[in-house]
Amino acid sequence: MKLPRSSLVWCVLIVCLTLLIFTYLTRKSLCEIRYRDGYREVAAFMAYESGK
């Protein structure tokens, strides 16, 4: 089954938006995401500055 290119773009866009909305609803910030298990912790931070 081969999707047309425009359908593929829409599918990827919908998946990305769904992940962003889910992350926003379950976390207090989109700028910090942490994952912890028994032995490891992975943290991703987004740093940004205003261009003013």
From Swiss-Prot:
Location(s), subcellular: Cell inner membrane
Entries under InterPro entries matching the protein: Hok/gef_toxin, Hok/gef_toxin_CS
Keyword annotations from UniProtKB, A to Z: Cell inner membrane, Cell membrane, Membrane, Plasmid, Toxin-antitoxin system, Transmembrane, Transmembrane helix
Annotated membrane topology: Single-pass membrane protein
Membrane-spanning segments: 6-26
Main location: membrane
Conditions for induction: Part of the flmC-flmA operon; the antisense antitoxin RNA flmB of this system overlaps the ribosome-binding site and first 3 codons of flmC on the opposite strand.
GO cellular component: plasma membrane
Entries under NCBIfam families matching the protein: PRK09738.1
Record function comment: Toxic component of a type I toxin-antitoxin (TA) system. Part of the plasmid maintenance system, encodes a toxic protein that collapses the transmembrane potential and arrests respiration. When the adjacent non-translated flmB (sok) gene is disrupted FlmA no longer functions in plasmid maintenance (i.e. FlmB probably encodes an antisense antitoxin RNA). The flmA and flmB RNAs interact, and presence of flmB on a separate plasmid from one encoding flmA and flmB allows loss of the latter plasmid. Translation of FlmA may be coupled to the upstream flmC gene.
Family: Belongs to the Hok/Gef family.
Protein name listed in UniProt: Stable plasmid inheritance protein
Native source organism of the sequence: Escherichia coli (strain K12)
